[in-house]
């Protein structure tokens, strides 16, 4: 292809799929279960700190929040304890080794990357009263490729076992992680790459796509060189690139037109039309303009 538009790309395959085990590993390690009601309460507190849902989902800044500030508050699931806050902070921090070195990125505080009953998201609670969570189905499927044990369940993974699984997957499938910035042949052939990612994506961490963009900048010697063939758009509030999340996303027509214009007519994309629609009626709820990513936007 002369042009590629990767929307909420499933790159860094090993890392983000195994990231679905992390919340369960945290609860297992700390011997404390965080209920869905308390989990939701933490999300609501993040939104409140940023001025409410609307303000939160339209901020271009990476949100930060310390769950310890909620200790002692009353939630629908009971009083928030130190143990609750410890689990929440560790989940937000993302997978890492015992010495603190990161394995991969977590999800931003305030982002709901889990569900109750519905097995969609990074992880889910099988029932509203569950005392255990489960990862997104692709996580265990991929992990079985790593261990070559088709019936392995990976329940009650310890932290050390999780890190070992993570390292084993990286070593075994290192050539298939879709994270290589050395796309020189594509670039030299005149190829153009557009990427976008919603900050409210519940399946793939937004920072993983930003990480790949930074690898491109490093590999090709700076942003000016990358600008000749690549554009990255980070859309606050947009879900998994579907335009019906909590903020507007780039439409298929706008994205494809921009890519075609760039590849066939040499017109580099700048601002792109984005929209938020009602998931059932299709009615337009919000419109806006997506702008190319700049480092000061999200640090």
Regions inferred by a protein language model and the residue ranges of each:
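C-terminal His-loop and adjacent cap/lid subdomain of alpha/beta-hydrolase
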Residues: 1-299
């Amino acid at each position: 292809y002369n042009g590629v538009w990767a929307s909420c790309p499933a790159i860094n395959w090993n890392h983000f799929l195994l990231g679905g085990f992390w919340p369960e590993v945290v609860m297992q390690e700390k011997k404390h279960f965080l209920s869905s009601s308390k989990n939701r309460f933490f999300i609501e507190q993040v939104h409140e700190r940023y001025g409410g849902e609307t303000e939160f989902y339209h901020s271009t800044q990476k949100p930060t929040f310390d769950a310890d500030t909620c200790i002692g508050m009353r939630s629908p699931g009971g009083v928030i304890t130190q143990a609750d806050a410890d689990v929440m902070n560790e989940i937000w921090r993302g997978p890492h080794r015992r010495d603190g070195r990161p394995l991969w990125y977590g999800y931003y505080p305030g982002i709901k990357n889990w569900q109750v009953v519905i097995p969609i998201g990074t992880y889910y609670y099988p029932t509203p009263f569950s005392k255990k969570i489960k990862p997104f189905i692709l996580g265990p499927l991929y992990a079985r490729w790593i261990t070559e044990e088709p019936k392995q369940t990976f329940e009650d993974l310890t932290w050390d076992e999780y890190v070992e699984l993570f390292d084993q997957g990286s070593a075994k499938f290192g050539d298939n992680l879709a994270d290589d910035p050395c796309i020189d042949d594509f670039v030299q052939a005149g190829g153009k790459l557009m990427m976008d990612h919603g900050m409210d994506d519940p399946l793939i961490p937004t920072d993983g796509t930003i990480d790949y963009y930074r690898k491109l900048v490093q590999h090709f010697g700076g942003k000016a060189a990358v600008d000749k063939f690549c554009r990255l758009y980070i859309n606050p509030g947009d879900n998994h690139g579907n335009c019906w999340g909590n903020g507007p996303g780039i439409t298929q027509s706008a994205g494809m037109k921009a890519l075609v214009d760039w590849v066939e007519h040499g017109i580099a994309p700048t601002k792109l039309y984005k929209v938020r629609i009602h998931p059932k009626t299709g009615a337009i709820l919000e419109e806006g303009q997506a702008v190319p990513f700049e480092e000061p936007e999200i640090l």
